[in-house]
């Protein structure tokens, strides 16, 4: 099917929900750049699809946990969340919250970064980090090389999600979070499909059976994906759903 063909037959929103077969796999989906538009607002067309997904739906994001938890709530879905790039794993059905990471080391990195004259780039209210439990995020407007150097000195790593630089433990990832959450749910993590757009989705792609990058994805996500959608952002997610439908029809 060509891009033009797919654009002509790609249903959106409520129309697409009527075409979702029960045989669709469990899904792990990113938020920023995947369910949103370029303005970072949620694309309203993705909401009914996520709400009606016939299998398990996991929200896997670099955001702190209040954001994906709220998204699950407003979608009317069970709270199944991988937050902070795998640092926080929440399973509502089994009443489990697990934390992995080194928040003290992340704080030490930021303090050393500031001591060298740099800032995190956020306003004093810092709603980006206020609720973080396992990592810290620095604005992409701040210099990256010194941040990477200081993080390495503390045994941490920096992941560029395209929206922020995340200072985190190297052994924490969305992919490992998916394995943990799938275990809680007694599901095979390799049965999942995954949709994302960024370097921090690569580990999820490596675990999932089907990995789809939206058209605005960075090079790392594109290289790790099985498919890359013709469309970008939220429209790319709908395109990914179309591809998943084709794979089970």
For every predicted segment, state its role.
Residues 119-208, 212, 216, 220-222:
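Conserved acidic, metal-coordinating active-site core of Asp-based
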Residues 19-40, 205:
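Asp-based phosphoryl-transfer active-site loop
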Residues 227-232:
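Short acidic-hydrophobic, aromatic-tinged amphipathic segments that line or gate anion-handling sites
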Residues 38-128:
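Active-site phosphate-binding/coordination module
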Residues 1-29:
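Non-catalytic pre-domain segments flanking phosphatase-related domains
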Residues 84-88, 216-219, 233-237:
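Short, acidic/turn-prone active-site loops that include or flank metal/cofactor-
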Residues 53, 75-77, 85, 152-154, ...:
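Short, structured coil segments at secondary-structure junctions
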């Amino acid at each position: 099917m060509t891009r033009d063909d797919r654009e002509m037959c790609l249903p959106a929103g409520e129309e697409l929900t009527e075409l979702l077969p029960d045989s669709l796999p469990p899904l792990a989906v990113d938020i920023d750049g995947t369910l949103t538009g370029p303005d970072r607002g949620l694309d309203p067309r993705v909401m009914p699809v996520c709400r009606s997904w016939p299998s398990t739906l996991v929200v896997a994001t670099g955001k702190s946990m209040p954001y994906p938890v709220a998204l699950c709530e407003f979608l009317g879905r069970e709270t199944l969340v991988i937050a902070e790039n795998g640092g926080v794993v929440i399973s509502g059905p089994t009443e489990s919250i697990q934390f992995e990471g080194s928040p003290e080391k992340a704080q030490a990195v930021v303090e050393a970064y500031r001591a060298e004259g740099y800032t995190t780039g956020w306003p004093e209210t810092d709603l980006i980090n206020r609720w973080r439990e396992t990592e810290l995020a620095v604005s992409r407007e701040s210099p990256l090389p010194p941040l990477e150097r200081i993080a390495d000195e503390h045994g941490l790593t920096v992941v560029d999600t395209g929206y922020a630089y995340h200072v985190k433990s190297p052994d924490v990832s969305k992919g490992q979070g998916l394995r943990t959450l799938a275990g809680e749910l007694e599901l095979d993590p390799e049965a999942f499909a995954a949709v994302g757009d960024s370097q921090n989705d690569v580990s999820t792609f490596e675990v999932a059976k089907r990995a789809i990058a939206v058209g605005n994805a960075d090079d790392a996500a594109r290289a790790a994906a099985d498919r890359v959608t013709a469309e970008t952002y939220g429209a790319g997610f709908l395109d990914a759903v179309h591809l998943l439908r084709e794979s089970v029809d």
